[in-house]
Amino acid sequence: MRVKDTLNLGKTKFKMRGNLPVREAEWQKEWEENKLYEQRLKLNEGKPRFDLHDGPPFANGNIHMGHSLNKISKDIIVRFKNMNGYYAPYVPGWDTHGLPVEQQLAKKGVDRKTMDRAKYRELCRQFAEEQVQKQMADFKRLGVMADWDHPYITLQPKFEAEEIRVFGEMFKKGYIYKGKKPVYWSWSSESTLAEAEVEYHDIKSPRIYVAFPIKDGKGILDSDTSLVIWTTTPWTIPSNVGITVNPKFDYSVVEVNGKKYVIGSQRLSAVAEDLGWEDYKVVKTLKGTDFDRMTYQHPLYDVTGVIMNDTYVTADDGTGLVHNATGFGEDDYNVGRRYGLPVFSPMDAQGRFTKEVPDPDLVGMFYDDANKVVADKLEKAGALLKLSFFTHSYPHDWRTKKPVIYRATTQWFASIDKFRDQILAEIEKANFIPAWGKTRLYNMIKDRGDWVISRQRAWGVPLPIFYAEDDTPIVTPETIEHVAQIFEKEGSNAWYTYTAEELLPEGFKSEHSPNGKFRKETDILDVWFDSGSSWAGVMQERDGLGFPADLYLEGSDQYRGWFNSSLITSVAVTGKAPYKQVLSQGFVLDDKGHKMSKSLGNVISPNDVIKQMGAEIIRLWVAGADTTSDVAVSQDILRQSAESYRKIRNTMRFMLANTSDFDPKEDAIAYPDMSGVDQYMEIKLNRLIEEAIEAYNKFDFNSVYKKVFSFISNDLSAFYLDFAKDILYIDAEDSETRRSMQTVIYDVLVKLTKLMTPILPHTMEEVWGYLKEPEDYVQLANMPEVDHFANEDEVLADWNAFMKVRSDVLKALEKARNAKVIGKSFEAHVTLYPTEETKALLDKLNANIRQILIVSDLTISDEEAPENAEKLPTASIVVEHAAGEVCPRCRRTTTDVGSDPRFPELCARCAAIVAENFPEAEKEGLEK
């Protein structure tokens, strides 16, 4: 008989390698076929609700690592909530309207301007639906559990109808109006943009100082004096109608080179240096209020401008005097309106000057090309004091990446002025993670202007507005509901297939249309109004969902996006915020802090990672990330996640193998009968569960991951399971010490598997298949209960103290290894000269300390430590090579090898175990 045959070597079919790219897909197919999502919800019927509302990603292109971070985070939360006593449905959504779809069709050669609008929109719909299906497959492959058969999509007729009703309610309350004012205008998209659709990039721009001569100085300034302005947009000078000064500032009239100029006193030294004025003198100082309603002459055209007062003028840069073009700036517009100035915006949708511009040379010219022309004309007129160039951050269209301008156009707006305070009060009631999110959103709402909700595009939800014969806009509760019902049945394309009269309620009349003729609005709603209405189209409308949602979770850019638009529409209509909690996450960057881009070659595709490593590795990366700030990802970082995964998997495999002969119903040892170290591990396990569940409840997966991984690495692998081999392999199969340890290991397996299922559902489902538990799937089990024990504080204190003794012994062993006294720790004879405190502790523990320290021999001495002892906090320690021979069965070096004549090759312990449990060994003899 071989010595090996007398050992309890664990067996399991749970493989060392996960083969995740293959096995995950098989698990997902099985879950879908067995309707696990539906099963889980059925189990939870009647339990408290938890509604996480999915912010809809845009349906365009393959998913990226940012999508993975977002969707996996949501999946972890929903899985945890469902396993922890909540009814937690998850309806995934998609945002499908807007410019990106139109851009994709343009790339395919589809021209929206020459095509029937309804047919064009049908092509858009088909493309968007294809993208939804592609992304859905990708999200499923990440292991996300959701109601995939019933997603919400912003192009769905029912959703569009609810969005129309939200608009109608806001209109009825007086929050929607039509006006002409400067808005972000994308000449590349030929449409307005909301603030959330603008991003900033560095560009090189000209900056000029221009002199505007005084025309009527009201007896205070002479006509030989000029106002000096500074601007980075020379192309707006032809549209100048005013100059603004700050009424609280002082202004200096300076004489230089025989000419007089007005400059803000706080800016004088900086401007003089920039203009190279070495010899100038201040001839007069005026208050900003002195300038009010003076006039000046435009340096290029026969146009008289007015000087205005407003505190938006700062002394941070420029001259303290601001050139105003009311059609090309928000502040310009606001101050101009107070002074009764016209809104002058001589530019078309493509950024080209129209014939209204007072300069024939500029008509038809692109605004950016006009910079040089205008500067040259100013120089010829003697009005250009300086031209230079600088690089600065400038707004760009987030889709086309082209610069945008402010341009006054007639648009539909939503104003929050009437209910701003109500929104702010709702923000105060909500919980934000991180906490700074509350301040950020509060300040955005406090300071935000009106929301331009109209767009000059084709693919979107039409603005449900009719115009009478005298151009009066018609929006009534009856027209809104009639259009909503049509959209609900046929979709919003009905707006383009029916006449205005067919879309209006039967017999509809208006005093503004004596002939009964009406026309339809051609603009569509901003896509942020689409997604911002999802609380109505999904959470309020669908059975099984609740309003307000318990949680909105998106990237931190959504404070100005979805968090913002949803809040405005919801408070406008219901008086309540659509969410109780908001969780924001950072952006995914590479390991050097750069954005992912093809040009940098740092793009990591989730689909590529899944093919190479598996979705579990991405899920572990998500769980291990601190998402309160930007999250780094690279091949190296993913390899680290893969290493962590291997550690987890191999630890689970070891525990499965060593409980394969354990039946929890027959073999379990009760807690009071366990050894002290087994009790210690039970207590540590339950403390872990308590802390991890608390972290899950705070959506702090990073802490869950760290705590679980630390427990696996430090408490299990590096400690408990390390010395466990001497019991699991060597002791008799049915010995109480072995069964006690197996009881703990099995408990660890069951509870860790449940605890880690939200993060690693595929792997934990695989582990579950080897356990003897009643649920067919771990996803149908609940989070582990936390067990408490009467003696847990005492046991923890004692064994935590012992771990310090162990740490000192490990240091002494390491030193002895380096000195070549021993090879492996198991060859050592350790003599401890403990402190009184340590001696009392070791006596109290009454444990097999030698076995736990994994050494061959241990002596605890009351004598004084010799000079060569390693003096450490808990004991002085001497490490020597153990005397005797190595037992081939337990590998311990001991002097009692051969003490039992029946088994001369074994130590006394092993001989006794073999004799009792393998009687045939004595007859056959043992072979190594």
UniProtKB/Swiss-Prot annotation:
GO (cellular component) term, any one: cytosol
Family classification: Belongs to the class-I aminoacyl-tRNA synthetase family. IleS type 1 subfamily.
Motif 'KMSKS' region, residue numbers: 595-599
Residue positions binding L-isoleucyl-5'-AMP: 554
Organism: Lactobacillus johnsonii (strain CNCM I-12250 / La1 / NCC 533)
Cited InterPro entries: aa-tRNA-synth_I_CS (IPR001412), aa-tRNA-synth_Ia (IPR002300), Anticodon_Ile_BEm (IPR033708), Ile-tRNA-ligase (IPR002301), Ile-tRNA-ligase_type1 (IPR023585), Ile-tRNA_ligase (IPR050081), M/V/L/I-tRNA-synth_anticd-bd (IPR013155), Rossmann-like_a/b/a_fold (IPR014729)
Cofactor note: Binds 1 zinc ion per subunit.
Binding positions for Zn(2+) per the UniProt entry: 887, 890, 907, 910
Record's function text: Catalyzes the attachment of isoleucine to tRNA(Ile). As IleRS can inadvertently accommodate and process structurally similar amino acids such as valine, to avoid such errors it has two additional distinct tRNA(Ile)-dependent editing activities. One activity is designated as 'pretransfer' editing and involves the hydrolysis of activated Val-AMP. The other activity is designated 'posttransfer' editing and involves deacylation of mischarged Val-tRNA(Ile).
EC number per UniProt: 6.1.1.5
Pfam family, one: tRNA-synt_1
Gene expressing this chain: ileS
Catalytic activity: tRNA(Ile) + L-isoleucine + ATP = L-isoleucyl-tRNA(Ile) + AMP + diphosphate
Entry protein name: Isoleucine--tRNA ligase
Required cofactor(s): Zn(2+)
Gene Ontology terms, MF aspect: aminoacyl-tRNA deacylase activity; ATP binding; isoleucine-tRNA ligase activity; tRNA binding; zinc ion binding
BP GO annotations: isoleucyl-tRNA aminoacylation
Localisation: Cytoplasm
